[in-house]
Protein backbone atom coordinates (compact mmCIF):
# COMPACT_ATOMS: atom_id res chain seq x y z
CA UNK A 1 0.00 0.00 0.00
CA UNK A 2 1.38 3.43 -1.01
CA UNK A 3 2.06 6.25 1.39
CA UNK A 4 -0.95 8.28 0.20
CA UNK A 5 -3.31 5.37 -0.49
CA UNK A 6 -6.69 5.08 1.22
CA UNK A 7 -7.73 1.70 2.63
CA UNK A 8 -11.41 0.76 2.81
CA UNK A 9 -11.30 0.24 6.58
CA UNK A 10 -10.12 3.84 7.08
CA UNK A 11 -12.95 5.54 5.18
CA UNK A 12 -15.72 5.19 7.78
CA UNK A 13 -13.79 6.89 10.56
CA UNK A 14 -12.56 9.64 8.19
CA UNK A 15 -16.20 10.40 7.33
CA UNK A 16 -17.05 10.26 11.04
CA UNK A 17 -14.35 12.82 11.88
CA UNK A 18 -15.44 15.10 9.04
CA UNK A 19 -19.04 14.87 10.26
CA UNK A 20 -18.04 15.77 13.84
CA UNK A 21 -16.11 18.84 12.63
CA UNK A 22 -18.96 20.01 10.38
CA UNK A 23 -21.58 19.56 13.13
CA UNK A 24 -19.51 21.54 15.63
CA UNK A 25 -18.87 24.29 13.06
CA UNK A 26 -22.53 24.58 12.07
CA UNK A 27 -23.82 24.66 15.66
CA UNK A 28 -21.12 27.14 16.71
CA UNK A 29 -22.07 29.67 14.02
CA UNK A 30 -25.81 28.97 14.19
CA UNK A 31 -25.95 29.83 17.90
CA UNK A 32 -23.62 32.81 17.43
CA UNK A 33 -20.87 31.50 19.74
CA UNK A 34 -17.97 33.93 20.09
CA UNK A 35 -15.28 31.35 19.28
CA UNK A 36 -16.75 28.35 17.40
CA UNK A 37 -13.11 27.31 16.91
CA UNK A 38 -13.08 25.79 20.41
CA UNK A 39 -16.09 23.59 19.60
CA UNK A 40 -14.56 22.48 16.28
CA UNK A 41 -11.15 21.86 17.87
CA UNK A 42 -12.70 19.85 20.71
CA UNK A 43 -14.76 17.70 18.31
CA UNK A 44 -11.65 17.00 16.22
CA UNK A 45 -9.41 16.12 19.19
CA UNK A 46 -12.01 13.97 20.98
CA UNK A 47 -12.79 12.01 17.81
CA UNK A 48 -9.24 11.70 16.44
CA UNK A 49 -7.37 11.04 19.72
CA UNK A 50 -8.67 7.48 20.30
CA UNK A 51 -8.16 6.66 16.60
CA UNK A 52 -4.52 7.76 16.75
CA UNK A 53 -4.00 5.71 19.93
CA UNK A 54 -5.70 2.62 18.44
CA UNK A 55 -4.11 2.88 15.00
CA UNK A 56 -7.52 2.60 13.35
CA UNK A 57 -11.18 3.23 14.02
CA UNK A 58 -11.70 3.19 17.81
CA UNK A 59 -14.14 0.73 19.34
CA UNK A 60 -17.55 1.80 20.59
CA UNK A 61 -17.43 3.80 23.81
CA UNK A 62 -13.85 5.09 23.45
CA UNK A 63 -14.89 8.48 22.06
CA UNK A 64 -17.66 8.88 24.66
CA UNK A 65 -15.26 8.07 27.48
CA UNK A 66 -12.62 10.48 26.20
CA UNK A 67 -15.32 13.14 25.87
CA UNK A 68 -16.42 12.66 29.47
CA UNK A 69 -12.81 12.95 30.64
CA UNK A 70 -12.43 16.17 28.66
CA UNK A 71 -15.55 17.65 30.27
CA UNK A 72 -14.31 16.72 33.75
CA UNK A 73 -10.84 18.10 33.06
CA UNK A 74 -12.25 21.33 31.63
CA UNK A 75 -14.48 21.95 34.65
CA UNK A 76 -11.63 21.23 37.10
CA UNK A 77 -9.37 23.60 35.14
CA UNK A 78 -12.02 26.36 35.01
CA UNK A 79 -12.65 26.13 38.76
CA UNK A 80 -8.90 26.22 39.46
CA UNK A 81 -8.50 29.25 37.16
CA UNK A 82 -11.31 31.14 38.93
CA UNK A 83 -9.78 30.43 42.36
CA UNK A 84 -6.30 31.52 41.23
CA UNK A 85 -7.59 34.71 39.57
CA UNK A 86 -9.79 35.72 42.52
CA UNK A 87 -6.93 35.13 44.96
CA UNK A 88 -4.13 36.81 42.99
CA UNK A 89 -5.69 39.29 40.58
CA UNK A 90 -3.56 42.11 42.04
CA UNK A 91 -0.31 40.24 41.25
CA UNK A 92 -0.48 39.16 37.57
CA UNK A 93 3.04 37.70 37.41
CA UNK A 94 2.52 35.64 40.56
CA UNK A 95 -0.84 34.52 39.17
CA UNK A 96 0.78 33.16 35.99
CA UNK A 97 3.57 31.46 37.95
CA UNK A 98 1.02 29.76 40.22
CA UNK A 99 -0.77 28.55 37.07
CA UNK A 100 2.54 27.08 35.86
CA UNK A 101 2.87 25.21 39.16
CA UNK A 102 -0.78 24.06 38.84
CA UNK A 103 -0.04 22.66 35.36
CA UNK A 104 2.96 20.79 36.81
CA UNK A 105 0.86 19.50 39.71
CA UNK A 106 -1.79 18.15 37.33
CA UNK A 107 0.93 16.46 35.26
CA UNK A 108 2.31 14.90 38.47
CA UNK A 109 -1.11 13.46 39.34
CA UNK A 110 -1.70 12.26 35.77
CA UNK A 111 1.58 10.31 35.98
CA UNK A 112 0.35 8.41 39.05
CA UNK A 113 -3.28 7.61 38.16
CA UNK A 114 -4.52 5.05 35.63
CA UNK A 115 -3.45 5.91 32.09
CA UNK A 116 -7.12 5.95 30.98
CA UNK A 117 -7.99 8.70 33.49
CA UNK A 118 -4.77 10.71 33.25
CA UNK A 119 -6.13 12.69 30.27
CA UNK A 120 -8.56 14.59 32.52
CA UNK A 121 -5.81 15.76 34.88
CA UNK A 122 -3.46 16.77 32.08
CA UNK A 123 -6.28 18.75 30.46
CA UNK A 124 -7.23 20.53 33.70
CA UNK A 125 -3.64 21.78 34.04
CA UNK A 126 -3.43 23.61 30.74
CA UNK A 127 -7.10 24.71 30.76
CA UNK A 128 -6.44 26.89 33.82
CA UNK A 129 -3.35 28.34 32.13
CA UNK A 130 -5.28 29.13 28.92
CA UNK A 131 -7.96 31.01 30.88
CA UNK A 132 -5.48 32.99 32.99
CA UNK A 133 -3.42 33.99 29.92
CA UNK A 134 -6.46 34.91 27.82
CA UNK A 135 -8.04 37.27 30.40
CA UNK A 136 -4.83 39.19 31.20
CA UNK A 137 -6.17 42.36 29.56
CA UNK A 138 -9.75 42.02 30.89
CA UNK A 139 -9.71 40.01 34.16
CA UNK A 140 -13.30 40.99 35.01
CA UNK A 141 -14.51 38.83 32.10
CA UNK A 142 -13.10 35.66 33.67
CA UNK A 143 -16.45 34.05 34.68
CA UNK A 144 -17.92 34.78 31.25
CA UNK A 145 -14.88 33.38 29.43
CA UNK A 146 -14.81 30.24 31.61
CA UNK A 147 -18.52 29.66 30.99
CA UNK A 148 -18.15 30.18 27.23
CA UNK A 149 -15.19 27.82 27.06
CA UNK A 150 -17.05 25.11 28.98
CA UNK A 151 -20.13 25.53 26.76
CA UNK A 152 -18.15 25.37 23.52
CA UNK A 153 -16.21 22.32 24.68
CA UNK A 154 -19.39 20.51 25.72
CA UNK A 155 -20.89 21.29 22.28
CA UNK A 156 -17.78 19.93 20.55
CA UNK A 157 -17.85 16.75 22.64
CA UNK A 158 -21.57 16.30 21.94
CA UNK A 159 -20.90 16.59 18.20
CA UNK A 160 -18.10 14.00 18.36
CA UNK A 161 -20.32 11.56 20.27
CA UNK A 162 -23.26 12.12 17.89
CA UNK A 163 -21.05 11.50 14.85
CA UNK A 164 -19.75 8.33 16.53
CA UNK A 165 -23.29 7.05 17.05
CA UNK A 166 -24.43 7.98 13.53
CA UNK A 167 -21.75 5.85 11.89
CA UNK A 168 -22.35 2.66 13.90
CA UNK A 169 -19.14 2.28 15.93
CA UNK A 170 -17.40 -1.09 16.09
CA UNK A 171 -18.21 -3.33 19.05
CA UNK A 172 -15.28 -5.01 20.78
CA UNK A 173 -17.43 -7.91 22.03
CA UNK A 174 -16.52 -10.33 19.22
CA UNK A 175 -12.81 -9.59 19.73
CA UNK A 176 -13.21 -10.36 23.45
CA UNK A 177 -14.95 -13.68 22.71
CA UNK A 178 -12.23 -14.75 20.27
CA UNK A 179 -9.43 -13.73 22.62
CA UNK A 180 -10.95 -15.67 25.54
CA UNK A 181 -10.87 -18.88 23.48
CA UNK A 182 -7.39 -18.24 22.10
CA UNK A 183 -6.02 -17.33 25.54
CA UNK A 184 -7.17 -20.59 27.13
CA UNK A 185 -5.51 -22.63 24.36
CA UNK A 186 -2.30 -20.64 24.89
CA UNK A 187 -2.51 -21.27 28.65
CA UNK A 188 -2.74 -25.01 28.03
CA UNK A 189 0.23 -24.89 25.66
CA UNK A 190 2.26 -23.01 28.30
CA UNK A 191 1.55 -25.76 30.82
CA UNK A 192 2.63 -28.34 28.22
CA UNK A 193 5.96 -26.53 27.84
CA UNK A 194 6.41 -26.36 31.62
CA UNK A 195 5.61 -30.07 32.07
CA UNK A 196 8.16 -30.98 29.37
CA UNK A 197 10.69 -28.76 31.19
CA UNK A 198 12.33 -27.80 27.93
CA UNK A 199 14.22 -24.70 26.86
CA UNK A 200 13.89 -21.94 29.49
CA UNK A 201 13.99 -19.19 26.87
CA UNK A 202 11.00 -20.70 25.06
CA UNK A 203 9.09 -20.85 28.36
CA UNK A 204 10.04 -17.23 29.14
CA UNK A 205 8.75 -16.07 25.77
CA UNK A 206 5.52 -18.03 26.23
CA UNK A 207 4.63 -16.70 29.70
CA UNK A 208 5.75 -13.16 28.76
CA UNK A 209 3.42 -13.24 25.76
CA UNK A 210 0.57 -14.47 27.98
CA UNK A 211 1.15 -11.66 30.49
CA UNK A 212 0.87 -9.12 27.67
CA UNK A 213 -2.25 -10.76 26.23
CA UNK A 214 -3.91 -10.87 29.64
CA UNK A 215 -3.14 -7.16 30.10
CA UNK A 216 -4.60 -6.50 26.63
CA UNK A 217 -7.73 -8.46 27.57
CA UNK A 218 -8.12 -6.25 30.65
CA UNK A 219 -7.96 -3.23 28.33
CA UNK A 220 -10.66 -4.81 26.15
CA UNK A 221 -12.79 -5.25 29.28
CA UNK A 222 -12.52 -1.52 29.97
CA UNK A 223 -13.61 -0.77 26.40
CA UNK A 224 -16.54 -3.17 26.66
CA UNK A 225 -17.59 -1.57 29.94
CA UNK A 226 -17.62 1.87 28.25
CA UNK A 227 -19.56 0.55 25.26
CA UNK A 228 -22.94 -0.15 26.85
CA UNK A 229 -24.64 -0.89 30.17
CA UNK A 230 -25.88 -4.22 28.78
CA UNK A 231 -22.38 -5.66 29.24
CA UNK A 232 -22.40 -5.27 33.05
CA UNK A 233 -22.59 -9.04 33.63
CA UNK A 234 -19.84 -9.70 31.07
CA UNK A 235 -17.71 -7.05 32.75
CA UNK A 236 -18.01 -8.76 36.15
CA UNK A 237 -17.05 -12.11 34.65
CA UNK A 238 -14.10 -10.61 32.76
CA UNK A 239 -12.72 -9.13 35.99
CA UNK A 240 -12.65 -12.61 37.51
CA UNK A 241 -11.25 -14.09 34.28
CA UNK A 242 -8.33 -11.68 34.50
CA UNK A 243 -7.39 -13.13 37.90
CA UNK A 244 -7.91 -16.70 36.66
CA UNK A 245 -5.68 -16.14 33.63
CA UNK A 246 -2.92 -14.78 35.88
CA UNK A 247 -3.40 -17.74 38.24
CA UNK A 248 -2.92 -20.16 35.33
CA UNK A 249 0.34 -18.44 34.34
CA UNK A 250 1.59 -18.57 37.95
CA UNK A 251 0.78 -22.26 38.42
CA UNK A 252 2.40 -23.20 35.10
CA UNK A 253 5.62 -21.35 35.89
CA UNK A 254 5.73 -22.81 39.40
CA UNK A 255 5.39 -26.28 37.87
CA UNK A 256 8.46 -25.52 35.75
CA UNK A 257 10.46 -24.26 38.75
CA UNK A 258 9.52 -27.25 40.93
CA UNK A 259 11.03 -29.60 38.36
CA UNK A 260 14.40 -27.87 38.75
CA UNK A 261 14.76 -29.56 42.15
CA UNK A 262 12.04 -32.24 42.37
CA UNK A 263 11.10 -33.55 38.89
CA UNK A 264 9.61 -36.72 40.43
CA UNK A 265 6.61 -34.71 41.71
CA UNK A 266 5.13 -34.66 38.19
CA UNK A 267 4.04 -38.25 37.64
CA UNK A 268 4.09 -40.08 34.31
CA UNK A 269 0.27 -40.05 34.24
CA UNK A 270 0.14 -36.26 34.00
CA UNK A 271 3.08 -36.13 31.61
CA UNK A 272 1.18 -38.42 29.22
CA UNK A 273 -2.00 -36.34 29.59
CA UNK A 274 -0.21 -33.13 28.63
CA UNK A 275 1.51 -34.72 25.64
CA UNK A 276 -1.79 -34.61 23.71
CA UNK A 277 -1.67 -31.55 21.39
CA UNK A 278 -4.56 -29.05 21.48
CA UNK A 279 -5.60 -26.55 18.82
CA UNK A 280 -9.08 -25.39 19.85
CA UNK A 281 -10.89 -24.58 23.07
CA UNK A 282 -12.97 -27.74 22.58
CA UNK A 283 -9.75 -29.80 22.70
CA UNK A 284 -8.83 -28.09 25.98
CA UNK A 285 -12.31 -28.81 27.37
CA UNK A 286 -11.96 -32.53 26.58
CA UNK A 287 -8.50 -32.66 28.17
CA UNK A 288 -9.74 -30.93 31.34
CA UNK A 289 -12.51 -33.54 31.66
CA UNK A 290 -9.92 -36.32 31.47
CA UNK A 291 -7.72 -34.59 34.04
CA UNK A 292 -10.56 -34.13 36.51
CA UNK A 293 -11.33 -37.86 36.25
CA UNK A 294 -7.66 -38.71 36.83
CA UNK A 295 -7.50 -36.39 39.87
CA UNK A 296 -10.63 -38.01 41.35
CA UNK A 297 -9.13 -41.44 40.73
CA UNK A 298 -5.62 -40.70 42.09
CA UNK A 299 -6.80 -38.44 44.90
CA UNK A 300 -5.96 -34.82 45.68
CA UNK A 301 -2.99 -35.74 47.88
CA UNK A 302 -1.33 -37.70 45.07
CA UNK A 303 -1.72 -34.78 42.65
CA UNK A 304 0.92 -32.01 42.59
CA UNK A 305 -0.63 -28.89 44.13
CA UNK A 306 0.26 -26.75 41.11
CA UNK A 307 -1.52 -29.11 38.69
CA UNK A 308 -4.52 -29.45 40.98
CA UNK A 309 -4.81 -25.65 41.26
CA UNK A 310 -4.25 -25.20 37.52
CA UNK A 311 -7.04 -27.62 36.55
CA UNK A 312 -9.42 -25.94 39.01
CA UNK A 313 -8.62 -22.46 37.67
CA UNK A 314 -8.97 -23.63 34.04
CA UNK A 315 -12.37 -25.19 34.83
CA UNK A 316 -13.59 -21.94 36.40
CA UNK A 317 -12.20 -20.07 33.38
CA UNK A 318 -14.29 -22.24 31.02
CA UNK A 319 -17.44 -21.67 33.06
CA UNK A 320 -17.07 -17.87 33.14
CA UNK A 321 -16.00 -17.76 29.48
CA UNK A 322 -19.29 -19.33 28.42
CA UNK A 323 -21.12 -16.72 30.49
CA UNK A 324 -19.24 -13.86 28.82
CA UNK A 325 -20.01 -15.16 25.32
CA UNK A 326 -23.72 -15.72 26.02
CA UNK A 327 -24.10 -12.73 28.43
CA UNK A 328 -26.77 -14.67 30.32
CA UNK A 329 -27.85 -14.21 33.91
CA UNK A 330 -25.12 -15.04 36.44
CA UNK A 331 -25.70 -18.49 37.97
CA UNK A 332 -25.22 -19.38 41.64
CA UNK A 333 -21.99 -21.24 40.84
CA UNK A 334 -20.62 -18.24 38.95
CA UNK A 335 -21.66 -15.93 41.78
CA UNK A 336 -19.53 -17.95 44.20
CA UNK A 337 -16.52 -17.45 41.94
CA UNK A 338 -17.23 -13.74 41.42
CA UNK A 339 -17.66 -13.11 45.15
CA UNK A 340 -14.25 -14.68 45.77
CA UNK A 341 -11.59 -12.27 47.00
CA UNK A 342 -11.24 -8.46 47.18
CA UNK A 343 -8.67 -7.15 44.69
CA UNK A 344 -5.92 -5.04 46.27
CA UNK A 345 -4.57 -1.96 44.47
CA UNK A 346 -0.85 -1.41 44.68
CA UNK A 347 0.94 1.88 45.31
CA UNK A 348 2.57 3.42 42.23
CA UNK A 349 6.29 2.73 41.78
CA UNK A 350 6.75 5.77 39.51
CA UNK A 351 6.74 8.56 42.09
CA UNK A 352 10.20 9.77 41.10
CA UNK A 353 9.20 9.66 37.43
CA UNK A 354 6.07 11.67 38.30
CA UNK A 355 8.21 14.28 40.07
CA UNK A 356 10.43 14.59 36.98
CA UNK A 357 7.29 15.18 34.92
CA UNK A 358 6.18 17.86 37.42
CA UNK A 359 9.45 19.76 37.01
CA UNK A 360 9.44 19.36 33.23
CA UNK A 361 5.97 20.87 32.90
CA UNK A 362 6.48 23.59 35.53
CA UNK A 363 9.89 24.69 34.22
CA UNK A 364 8.77 24.70 30.58
CA UNK A 365 5.73 26.86 31.45
CA UNK A 366 7.88 29.25 33.52
CA UNK A 367 10.41 29.40 30.66
CA UNK A 368 7.55 30.29 28.30
CA UNK A 369 6.42 33.04 30.69
CA UNK A 370 9.91 34.55 30.86
CA UNK A 371 10.23 34.33 27.06
CA UNK A 372 6.87 36.10 26.66
CA UNK A 373 7.70 38.89 29.13
CA UNK A 374 11.26 39.36 27.85
CA UNK A 375 10.38 39.57 24.14
CA UNK A 376 6.99 41.25 24.50
CA UNK A 377 5.90 39.15 21.50
CA UNK A 378 2.19 39.46 20.81
CA UNK A 379 1.90 35.70 20.32
CA UNK A 380 3.99 34.78 23.34
CA UNK A 381 0.78 33.73 25.08
CA UNK A 382 0.09 31.29 22.22
CA UNK A 383 3.56 29.81 22.66
CA UNK A 384 2.87 29.40 26.38
CA UNK A 385 -0.38 27.59 25.69
CA UNK A 386 1.38 25.17 23.32
CA UNK A 387 4.11 24.55 25.91
CA UNK A 388 1.47 23.63 28.50
CA UNK A 389 -0.51 21.46 26.07
CA UNK A 390 2.54 19.56 24.78
CA UNK A 391 4.13 18.92 28.18
CA UNK A 392 0.83 18.00 29.88
CA UNK A 393 -0.05 15.46 27.18
CA UNK A 394 3.47 14.18 26.46
CA UNK A 395 4.51 13.50 30.05
CA UNK A 396 1.90 10.82 30.67
CA UNK A 397 3.05 8.74 27.68
CA UNK A 398 6.01 6.30 27.57
CA UNK A 399 8.01 8.36 25.04
CA UNK A 400 7.45 12.12 25.60
CA UNK A 401 10.22 13.07 23.16
CA UNK A 402 8.38 11.44 20.25
CA UNK A 403 5.14 13.20 21.27
CA UNK A 404 7.00 16.53 21.14
CA UNK A 405 8.43 15.67 17.72
CA UNK A 406 4.91 14.78 16.55
CA UNK A 407 3.66 18.20 17.68
CA UNK A 408 6.63 19.97 16.04
CA UNK A 409 5.98 18.20 12.73
CA UNK A 410 2.28 18.95 13.09
CA UNK A 411 2.73 22.67 13.73
CA UNK A 412 5.19 22.93 10.83
CA UNK A 413 2.70 21.20 8.51
CA UNK A 414 -0.09 23.45 9.84
CA UNK A 415 1.70 26.59 8.60
CA UNK A 416 1.28 25.99 4.81
CA UNK A 417 -2.01 24.16 5.30
CA UNK A 418 -3.41 26.94 7.47
CA UNK A 419 -2.08 29.51 5.00
CA UNK A 420 -4.07 27.87 2.20
CA UNK A 421 -7.27 27.99 4.26
CA UNK A 422 -6.63 31.49 5.63
CA UNK A 423 -5.74 33.20 2.34
CA UNK A 424 -7.74 31.25 -0.23
CA UNK A 425 -10.42 28.86 0.98
CA UNK A 426 -12.11 30.58 3.96
CA UNK A 427 -12.30 34.10 2.40
CA UNK A 428 -14.00 32.57 -0.65
CA UNK A 429 -16.42 30.39 1.33
CA UNK A 430 -17.39 32.56 4.34
CA UNK A 431 -20.50 33.81 2.57
CA UNK A 432 -21.77 30.24 2.19
CA UNK A 433 -22.09 28.00 5.25
CA UNK A 434 -22.36 24.97 2.96
CA UNK A 435 -19.04 25.68 1.21
CA UNK A 436 -17.33 26.48 4.52
CA UNK A 437 -18.52 23.18 6.01
CA UNK A 438 -17.44 21.24 2.91
CA UNK A 439 -13.97 22.79 2.97
CA UNK A 440 -13.40 21.78 6.60
CA UNK A 441 -14.96 18.35 5.95
CA UNK A 442 -12.30 17.73 3.28
CA UNK A 443 -9.59 18.70 5.79
CA UNK A 444 -11.07 16.39 8.43
CA UNK A 445 -11.48 13.49 5.98
CA UNK A 446 -7.90 13.38 4.70
CA UNK A 447 -6.27 14.01 8.07
CA UNK A 448 -8.62 11.36 9.51
CA UNK A 449 -7.09 8.86 7.09
CA UNK A 450 -3.55 9.77 8.18
CA UNK A 451 -4.42 9.75 11.90
CA UNK A 452 -5.50 6.10 11.64
CA UNK A 453 -2.12 5.26 10.06
CA UNK A 454 -0.41 6.97 13.02
CA UNK A 455 1.40 9.20 10.57
CA UNK A 456 3.96 11.32 12.43
CA UNK A 457 2.60 14.85 12.79
CA UNK A 458 -0.96 14.05 11.67
CA UNK A 459 -2.59 14.60 15.07
CA UNK A 460 -0.61 17.79 15.70
CA UNK A 461 -1.41 19.08 12.20
CA UNK A 462 -5.15 18.59 12.71
CA UNK A 463 -5.26 20.48 16.02
CA UNK A 464 -2.78 23.19 14.98
CA UNK A 465 -4.48 23.93 11.65
CA UNK A 466 -7.91 24.35 13.24
CA UNK A 467 -6.37 26.50 15.98
CA UNK A 468 -4.83 29.08 13.60
CA UNK A 469 -7.46 29.44 10.86
CA UNK A 470 -10.14 32.07 11.43
CA UNK A 471 -13.18 30.36 12.96
CA UNK A 472 -14.29 33.21 15.20
CA UNK A 473 -17.51 35.18 15.20
CA UNK A 474 -17.22 37.59 13.42
CA UNK A 475 -14.41 36.46 11.12
CA UNK A 476 -11.48 38.88 10.81
CA UNK A 477 -8.54 38.38 8.47
CA UNK A 478 -5.34 39.91 9.87
CA UNK A 479 -2.34 38.23 8.29
CA UNK A 480 0.06 39.37 11.02
CA UNK A 481 -2.19 37.80 13.66
CA UNK A 482 -2.35 34.53 11.71
CA UNK A 483 1.43 34.45 11.28
CA UNK A 484 1.98 35.21 14.96
CA UNK A 485 -0.35 32.38 15.98
CA UNK A 486 1.32 29.88 13.64
CA UNK A 487 4.84 30.86 14.73
CA UNK A 488 3.75 30.90 18.39
CA UNK A 489 2.68 27.26 18.09
CA UNK A 490 6.00 26.25 16.54
CA UNK A 491 8.09 28.16 19.10
CA UNK A 492 6.04 26.73 21.98
CA UNK A 493 6.61 23.16 20.79
CA UNK A 494 10.33 23.86 20.33
CA UNK A 495 10.69 25.27 23.86
CA UNK A 496 8.83 22.28 25.34
CA UNK A 497 11.11 19.91 23.42
CA UNK A 498 14.22 21.73 24.69
CA UNK A 499 13.05 21.46 28.31
CA UNK A 500 12.31 17.73 27.92
CA UNK A 501 15.82 17.22 26.51
CA UNK A 502 17.47 19.25 29.29
CA UNK A 503 15.50 17.83 32.24
CA UNK A 504 16.62 14.22 31.86
CA UNK A 505 14.47 11.44 33.24
CA UNK A 506 16.87 9.12 35.08
CA UNK A 507 14.17 7.42 37.11
CA UNK A 508 14.10 4.19 35.08
CA UNK A 509 16.58 2.24 37.24
CA UNK A 510 15.02 3.54 40.45
CA UNK A 511 11.55 2.54 39.27
CA UNK A 512 12.83 -0.95 38.41
CA UNK A 513 14.38 -1.37 41.85
CA UNK A 514 11.22 -0.12 43.61
CA UNK A 515 9.13 -2.56 41.56
CA UNK A 516 11.36 -5.50 42.50
CA UNK A 517 11.27 -4.52 46.19
CA UNK A 518 7.48 -4.28 46.01
CA UNK A 519 7.46 -7.89 44.78
CA UNK A 520 9.60 -8.83 47.78
CA UNK A 521 7.25 -6.96 50.12
CA UNK A 522 4.25 -8.76 48.61
CA UNK A 523 5.91 -12.16 49.15
CA UNK A 524 6.78 -11.26 52.75
CA UNK A 525 3.28 -9.91 53.45
CA UNK A 526 1.83 -13.28 52.40
CA UNK A 527 3.39 -14.79 55.54
CA UNK A 528 0.46 -14.08 57.85
CA UNK A 529 -2.21 -15.86 59.85
CA UNK A 530 -4.67 -12.96 59.55
CA UNK A 531 -7.72 -14.37 57.72
CA UNK A 532 -8.70 -11.05 56.11
CA UNK A 533 -5.17 -10.39 54.84
CA UNK A 534 -4.88 -13.93 53.43
CA UNK A 535 -8.08 -13.42 51.43
CA UNK A 536 -6.75 -10.30 49.70
CA UNK A 537 -6.18 -10.85 45.98
CA UNK A 538 -2.90 -9.14 45.08
CA UNK A 539 -2.34 -11.13 41.88
CA UNK A 540 -3.73 -8.54 39.37
CA UNK A 541 -1.71 -5.77 41.04
CA UNK A 542 1.48 -7.86 41.02
CA UNK A 543 1.13 -8.73 37.34
CA UNK A 544 0.34 -5.10 36.56
CA UNK A 545 3.70 -4.25 38.14
CA UNK A 546 5.35 -7.07 36.17
CA UNK A 547 3.84 -5.69 32.95
CA UNK A 548 5.26 -2.25 33.81
CA UNK A 549 8.66 -3.85 34.48
CA UNK A 550 8.53 -5.59 31.09
CA UNK A 551 7.76 -2.28 29.36
CA UNK A 552 10.50 -0.41 31.25
CA UNK A 553 13.17 -3.08 30.69
CA UNK A 554 12.32 -4.97 27.46
CA UNK A 555 14.42 -8.10 27.08
CA UNK A 556 15.80 -8.09 30.66
CA UNK A 557 14.97 -11.73 31.41
CA UNK A 558 16.75 -11.93 34.82
CA UNK A 559 14.53 -9.14 36.17
CA UNK A 560 11.39 -10.80 34.80
CA UNK A 561 12.33 -14.18 36.26
CA UNK A 562 13.07 -12.66 39.67
CA UNK A 563 9.74 -10.82 39.67
CA UNK A 564 7.85 -13.94 38.58
CA UNK A 565 9.58 -15.99 41.29
CA UNK A 566 8.43 -13.46 43.91
CA UNK A 567 4.86 -13.67 42.58
CA UNK A 568 4.99 -17.48 42.80
CA UNK A 569 6.36 -17.24 46.35
CA UNK A 570 3.54 -14.87 47.29
CA UNK A 571 0.86 -17.22 45.94
CA UNK A 572 2.38 -20.29 47.56
CA UNK A 573 2.85 -18.65 50.99
CA UNK A 574 -0.63 -17.16 50.82
CA UNK A 575 -2.12 -20.67 50.67
CA UNK A 576 0.41 -22.28 53.04
CA UNK A 577 -0.95 -23.71 56.35
CA UNK A 578 1.10 -21.46 58.67
CA UNK A 579 0.68 -22.41 62.37
CA UNK A 580 -1.62 -19.96 64.16
CA UNK A 581 -0.05 -18.52 67.33
CA UNK A 582 0.81 -15.13 68.81
CA UNK A 583 4.58 -15.58 68.53
CA UNK A 584 4.48 -16.01 64.74
CA UNK A 585 1.84 -13.28 64.32
CA UNK A 586 4.05 -10.71 66.07
CA UNK A 587 7.01 -11.75 63.92
CA UNK A 588 4.91 -11.47 60.73
CA UNK A 589 4.21 -7.81 61.57
CA UNK A 590 7.92 -7.22 62.16
CA UNK A 591 8.79 -8.75 58.77
CA UNK A 592 6.25 -6.51 57.01
CA UNK A 593 7.61 -3.40 58.72
CA UNK A 594 11.16 -4.23 57.68
CA UNK A 595 10.06 -4.92 54.07
CA UNK A 596 8.29 -1.53 53.99
CA UNK A 597 11.48 0.14 55.26
CA UNK A 598 13.40 -1.43 52.35
CA UNK A 599 10.98 0.15 49.84
CA UNK A 600 10.89 3.60 51.49
CA UNK A 601 14.65 3.86 52.22
CA UNK A 602 16.06 7.11 50.84
CA UNK A 603 19.65 5.93 50.28
CA UNK A 604 21.50 2.78 49.24
CA UNK A 605 23.14 2.47 52.67
CA UNK A 606 19.80 2.48 54.49
CA UNK A 607 18.34 0.10 51.96
CA UNK A 608 21.21 -2.36 52.38
CA UNK A 609 20.93 -2.15 56.16
CA UNK A 610 17.19 -2.82 56.17
CA UNK A 611 17.57 -5.58 53.56
CA UNK A 612 20.25 -7.27 55.67
CA UNK A 613 17.91 -6.96 58.65
CA UNK A 614 15.13 -8.59 56.59
CA UNK A 615 17.41 -11.53 55.69
CA UNK A 616 18.39 -11.99 59.35
CA UNK A 617 14.74 -11.93 60.38
CA UNK A 618 13.87 -14.52 57.73
CA UNK A 619 16.57 -16.81 59.16
CA UNK A 620 15.05 -16.35 62.63
CA UNK A 621 11.59 -16.98 61.16
CA UNK A 622 12.72 -20.29 59.66
CA UNK A 623 13.98 -21.33 63.08
CA UNK A 624 10.63 -20.38 64.63
CA UNK A 625 8.81 -22.46 62.01
CA UNK A 626 11.00 -25.42 62.93
CA UNK A 627 10.23 -24.92 66.64
CA UNK A 628 6.50 -24.72 65.97
CA UNK A 629 6.70 -27.81 63.71
CA UNK A 630 5.39 -26.15 60.57
CA UNK A 631 4.71 -28.56 57.65
CA UNK A 632 6.90 -28.67 54.50
CA UNK A 633 4.22 -26.69 52.60
CA UNK A 634 5.33 -23.70 54.74
CA UNK A 635 9.04 -24.28 55.33
CA UNK A 636 9.99 -25.06 51.73
CA UNK A 637 8.55 -21.84 50.16
CA UNK A 638 10.10 -19.74 52.94
CA UNK A 639 13.46 -21.42 52.35
CA UNK A 640 13.21 -20.83 48.58
CA UNK A 641 12.27 -17.17 49.16
CA UNK A 642 15.19 -16.60 51.54
CA UNK A 643 17.59 -18.23 49.08
CA UNK A 644 16.34 -16.00 46.23
CA UNK A 645 16.75 -12.85 48.35
CA UNK A 646 20.32 -13.83 49.28
CA UNK A 647 21.13 -14.55 45.63
CA UNK A 648 19.75 -11.26 44.27
CA UNK A 649 20.63 -9.02 47.21
CA UNK A 650 22.72 -6.60 45.13
CA UNK A 651 20.09 -6.24 42.39
CA UNK A 652 17.44 -5.41 45.01
CA UNK A 653 19.46 -2.84 46.96
CA UNK A 654 21.80 -0.99 44.55
CA UNK A 655 20.57 2.01 42.56
UniProtKB/Swiss-Prot annotation:
Matching Pfam families: FUSC (PF04632)
GO molecular function: transmembrane transporter activity
Membrane topology: Multi-pass membrane protein
Gene: aaeB
Keyword Cytoplasm tagged: no
HAMAP family in the record: AaeB
Intracellular or extracellular location(s): Cell inner membrane
Keyword Cell membrane: yes
Function: Forms an efflux pump with AaeA. Could function as a metabolic relief valve, allowing to eliminate certain compounds when they accumulate to high levels in the cell.
InterPro entries: PHBA_efflux_AaeB/fusaric-R (IPR006726), PHBA_efflux_pump_AaeB (IPR023706)
Superkingdom as given in the UniProt entry: Bacteria
Name of the protein: p-hydroxybenzoic acid efflux pump subunit AaeB
Transmembrane intervals: 13-33, 38-58, 69-89, 93-113, 121-141, 152-172, 370-390, 407-427, 431-451, 459-479, 482-502
Family: Belongs to the aromatic acid exporter ArAE (TC 2.A.85) family.
Keywords, alphabetical: Cell inner membrane, Cell membrane, Membrane, Transmembrane, Transmembrane helix, Transport
GO cellular component terms, semicolon-separated: plasma membrane
One of the GO biological process terms: carboxylic acid transport
